[in-house]
């Protein structure tokens, strides 16, 4: 008797969709898709195509919130305009990176956000999918974060810049990125052959930096770096 051999699919792209194809053969994967579309078949599994990344989850997970977009999607709401791709996955034009925390919240009821993701981004997705409990949870998390940052000590960074009189106006007028003028000290004049004496000044500037669990709230911009470099030439 001839043996049947499965041709394994390559692993799916990275993200929460990983594992969707890897480990399944082409024939078995196609069979699962066909069964999911048959009446009385394996209909508890739902495939989503979010911004080009595939997610596989259960209908029960997506139906956690009866008022959500995903619940209506599973109920085949006629008022909901939804398309499917060639694999039968529901097409959702959203950021797949931020869909991960939303889907995991529906799975186990806990909000887990990687440190490289912004709470505001998760909130935007929660509002799009209309998941009421998640919206409240993320808003509370944002308020706690802002309150924690406001209570952290503020560091003042000072820089001393040396410049001539003709450079002073331009330097002060172009200062930005949080740098503030503090003090101007005259240090006399320098003599240039063939030119008149040039008055020289020390310009003291400062900037506030708020500490956060992941460092300061902002990295120095190009203009701030220029100020630092000029100050270091003294």
UniProtKB/Swiss-Prot annotation:
UniProt-listed GO biological process terms: protein homooligomerization
Domain BTB span(s) in chain numbering: 44-146
Keywords, sorted A to Z: Acetylation, Cytoplasm, Nucleus
Record comment regarding domains: The BTB (POZ) domain is atypical and mediates the formation of a homopentamer instead of a homotetramer. Homopentamerization is due to the presence of 4 residues in the BTB (POZ) domain: Leu-56, Gly-100, Val-112 and Ala-118.
Quaternary structure (record): Homopentamer. Interacts (via C-terminus) with GRASP55/GORASP2. Interacts with CUL3 and with ubiquitinated proteins. Interacts with CRY1.
Function: Its interaction with CUL3 suggests that it may act as a substrate adapter in some E3 ligase complex. Does not affect the function of Kv channel Kv2.1/KCNB1, Kv1.2/KCNA2, Kv4.2/KCND2 and Kv3.4/KCNC4.
Listed name of the protein: BTB/POZ domain-containing protein KCTD5
Organism: Mus musculus
Lineage: Eukaryota, Metazoa, Chordata, Craniata, Vertebrata
